[in-house]
Each structure stands twice: as structure tokens, then as C-alpha cells.
Amino acid sequence: MSKDSDYKRAEKHLSSIDNKWSSLVKKVGPCTLTPHPEHAPYEGIIRAITSQKLSDAATNSIINKFCTQCSDNDEFPTPKQIMETDVETLHECGFSKLKSQEIHIVAEAALNKQIPSKSEIEKMSEEELMESLSKIKGVKRWTIEMYSIFTLGRLDIMPADDSTLKNEAKEFFGLSSKPQTEEVEKLTKPCKPYRTIAAWYLWQIPKLHRKGQ
């Protein structure tokens, strides 16, 4: 089944839950989430690490500098090239000290075959993927969820611990305070099996505000 048909089914399902979801889907329009399954596993994980607590624009800027400074052809650096790049150079690209260290750890894990191959990952459930990748130091649940959404394109991921999503969930569900992770999971349970698309729509709420909606 194609991505477009999956998204249409997801939009129809979300719209059928209640008026709030129906209104949000209508205001935002069709889902334009674009995962990149062509990325190697280590690349997808590093991109997820880079994006934490940053805007899309800031993330893209850092990745572009990273590719320019750390590879020979402006493509995403290989694990070997990353290991040959010192923390100071990574910091110049825009990575924090902690993220620089985590990126080195992921690159080393890739070189040591500690990261499953694409074909192996495709056969894994989300629980199996969590168990496998969380063995890599610094790779936590949020990073794996972002990898599952933006690289693998899995449709039923709810990153309930994401701070931005919690803020949007507070507004969307009319809560008096920022929800706990468990509450987000409970509130979005009706969105199964399309929780990734539900998360994407919640992330669009600030854009609606900027448009005055």
C-alpha cells in the first residue's frame, strides 16, 4: 500500500474519532509527513539525536554543515569519517558537547556492527527495535521513536514523552496542565493504528496559530 493511501486512511480514521480530531484534520489539510527510509540506520539515529529540542530549520542547518565539513562529497558522513572528526569540529557544526559524544558513540556502534541492518530492522516490532537500539549508550526512547517516524515511516508511533507534543496535547484536549506521558498515551489510544499521523497533526497546531486559525 502506498504512503498516500495510508495517509488518507489515517485522516479518515482520525476524523471519525470526534469533532476535535475532525476539525484539526480539516484545518491542517492532508498529511505531508515525509519519512526517509533510504537513510542508513546510523544516519537516521544521528538525525534524530540532532533534532532533539531544535527546530527543523536549526536541525537542517547543523546537518548541512556536518555534511560539508565531515565528508568528502557533501553527503552524509560515513561512520569512519565521523569517528575521524573530533568533538571540537562537531561543535563548530552546531552540535552540543553531549550530542557530539552521542554521535561518536552511534558511529562506533555502526562500525562494530552493533546496529542492526535495514533488513533486520524491517522485521522488528517496535518493542524489539526499542530493546535493540537502547543498548547503544545515549540512544533513548525518544530518539528511537523519532527514528521510527522520520526514517522508517512507521504509522503507529506515539512519542508521548515529547515535550512539544505534550504542550499541543494540553491545548487540544483542553487540559488544565501539561499531561504526563501516560495521560498522552491514554488520550491518543483511539488514534491507533495511526498514532504517528495523530502526532503529526498535533505538531501542526502552532502553524495554525501563526495563520490565525
From Swiss-Prot:
The keyword DNA repair is annotated on this UniProt entry: yes
Classification via Pfam families: HhH-GPD (PF00730)
Originating species: Schizosaccharomyces pombe (strain 972 / ATCC 24843) (Fission yeast)
Protein location: Nucleus
Induction: Transcription is strongly induced following exposure to the alkylating agent methyl methanesulfonate (MMS) and oxidizing H(2)O(2).
UniProt-listed CDD domains: ENDO3c
Function summary: Alkylbase DNA glycosidase-like protein that shows no DNA glycosylase activity for alkylated bases. The molecular role of mag2 appears to be abasic (AP) site recognition and protection, while possibly facilitating damage signaling by structurally sculpting the DNA substrate. Stimulates AP site binding to mismatch repair protein mutS.
Name of the protein this chain belongs to: Alkylbase DNA glycosidase-like protein mag2
One GO process term, biological-process aspect: base-excision repair, AP site formation
Residues the entry annotates as binding DNA: 53-54, 61, 91, 94, 96-97, 99, 102, 137-138, 140, 143, 163-164
Gene Ontology CC: one annotated term: protein-DNA complex
Gene Ontology terms for molecular function: alkylated DNA binding; catalytic activity; DNA binding; DNA-(abasic site) binding
Main location: nucleus
SUPFAM superfamilies: DNA-glycosylase
Keywords recorded for this protein, A-Z: DNA damage, DNA repair, Nucleus
Similarity-based family: Belongs to the alkylbase DNA glycosidase AlkA family.
